């Protein structure tokens, strides 16, 4: 059989597709974007669109699917959201004037990390990350193409690279070196990233500058090269790459931020129930993004923190002026994203109108800030550049009722361009002339129903019904015949129509040209617009923090150099908001300069984790410049927070709960300094009791003797409380309980000293276990308490070379004397409650109750 001939159009498609094998190719054909071959089959499944075929009668028809060009953005969004790349091939000439195949070229490749336009605009940043490596050092650069933000840094190891990528919530990583297979698996399988290779750099002195290290410059230039290769245009909104160092901010791993619910609730993945949700009273998209950044990266420079506090205090002291400021901020649009649309050549009249409205608000915002008459605001006032000449240009040029498209006309204001006004006058007067002609001919002909209509095919015409055809004047000429009427024209009507159509065509072309010139003028202001955006975002975040401080009765923290923590009647900000102020029980947290470790004991469900998170959250809030929920707060400035809170297997990498515990503990004790905060919750519970206890004791001693970090260590190993006798910088605290008439009430109050009971049986009672089972458990507990566990201090261990924990058991007891074991007991033993959600525990207990 002869080989089927490929049409010139399909050959063009194949030639283009060859250059973009890893992307869906949307091939513009008239009013549709078409996909072919495997792209069509896969896209039809993902997008739920019809799969047809080209050359249906051929032996091997070509699979084909398409989407309308005017609604393509929604389909592109779906593909990109699922982690795919999309290459857009446009027609580069008018098909009516083309000789042969219409010229087509890819004009943009849209990837998860380079989204600019979207049918679902999101205020959050969308960071594209690049990584490079020289020797043992890693370079990392990231950019938000939609806002122009651009940063670069160096990192020590691959785990730090992964943590930073997670913190940035990146979805795509550009790799500038040969990845190890294991590292690639981590990025793809564990972090669910799209990887793109880029070995060439883009040399741009303006954007790279000389403030970066050689490695930072290398990775930043590769990121730039990838962006230019996918976006295929000059991007004037990209900002100069800024050097940053991780140590310039409060260091927290992604796991730590997740366990503290900083930006989203770890259980739901949603904003609600997070610190971000609580603090977000911003009124602008730019402010919202900046607030996320402040929460994600609290400061370690005390002077910078105090600068923020001072402005918040000014806002708190001036309620009415702050209220006016909040109202003005509501009229501010997303300057950064508008500037990027201008840079991409995609800004439409509505975008410029929004920019003009925003610029009109700047003098109002500036006047309000000046009315505070406070030096704390002087820096912000200098940065609030109102750009009056740009606001005047937009206001005078763009009609406030202009359409969103740039081809419909009606964009430019009357009076802005003399020639355009003349064309509009012709069109306006032409309409009046047509009305006069209609009235004149109606009277002259005696056709009372005579009227002039218009359509694109026949232009302007007189509409005459069949019953009036005998009255048609001789100077009328026939244009069209219909079933019940005919259409006529006259020389006079044709002349006016010609003048009007010429004016309309010239007006449309001129209006488009004027708009493009105005947009080009706006582009010259992009740098100043971005500086203005940062200033407004800062004002917005600070007013937001003032509002939350006032609404929730937060206090201004103070900082000390004595390594002292003193939080009087502190609260967990998010838990308090969810529960309500009346229900929440505050707790005082005290570490004097000689106390480094609090060993926290108490029942499960009593509030130990909330107490520890309360401190960590208070530190984050204080160092981002916010006020803190307490009666008073006195803190050192911490350099890092390390946590191990909660227990869950890392199923993707095959690591058990205990392995994850040990890895996170290792990160803490290796990296923490005396200026760090460590939060360990039930460390060691992922292994056998004595293994866990031995490791817990060793870790406590290591932190005490070698690290010196402020540490909260919650444990169910009550035997460890004896360490306070040998470790001078450790104190015991516990969650208070109230026992009365056999009933136990958890008071959620932290008090000095160790807990004397764990009340595990009481928790089981709350869960609804059978009474006879609970009674038997109580008997067994009494027998087990006859055993003794002696905690050896570290000095004794080292000198006698004995294990840290010695266990003396009087004799082996029979746990089930006079007791026939119910099979339910074994199922109960097998429950891994530390790796189950509360709902799963409740369902399991309910199932066990059914079997009793």
From Swiss-Prot:
Keywords: ATP-binding, DNA damage, DNA repair, DNA-binding, Nucleotide-binding. The keyword ATP-binding applies. GO terms for cellular component: cytosol. One of its GO terms (molecular function) is ATP-dependent DNA damage sensor activity. InterPro entries: DNA_mismatch_repair_MutS (IPR005748), DNA_mismatch_repair_MutS-lik_N (IPR007695), DNA_mismatch_repair_MutS/MSH (IPR017261), DNA_mismatch_repair_MutS_C (IPR000432), DNA_mismatch_repair_MutS_clamp (IPR007861), DNA_mismatch_repair_MutS_core (IPR007696), DNA_mismatch_repair_MutS_N (IPR016151), DNA_mismatch_repair_MutS_sf (IPR036187). SUPFAM superfamilies: DNA repair protein MutS, domain I (SSF55271), DNA repair protein MutS, domain II (SSF53150), DNA repair protein MutS, domain III (SSF48334), P-loop containing nucleoside triphosphate hydrolases (SSF52540). It comes from the Bacteria. It holds the Pfam family MutS_III. ATP binds at residues 602-609. One of its GO terms (biological process) is mismatch repair. Belongs to the DNA mismatch repair MutS family. This protein is involved in the repair of mismatches in DNA. It is possible that it carries out the mismatch recognition step. This protein has a weak ATPase activity. HAMAP family: MutS (MF_00096). This is DNA mismatch repair protein MutS. The lineage of its organism: Bacteria, Bacillati, Bacillota, Bacilli, Lactobacillales. The gene is mutS.
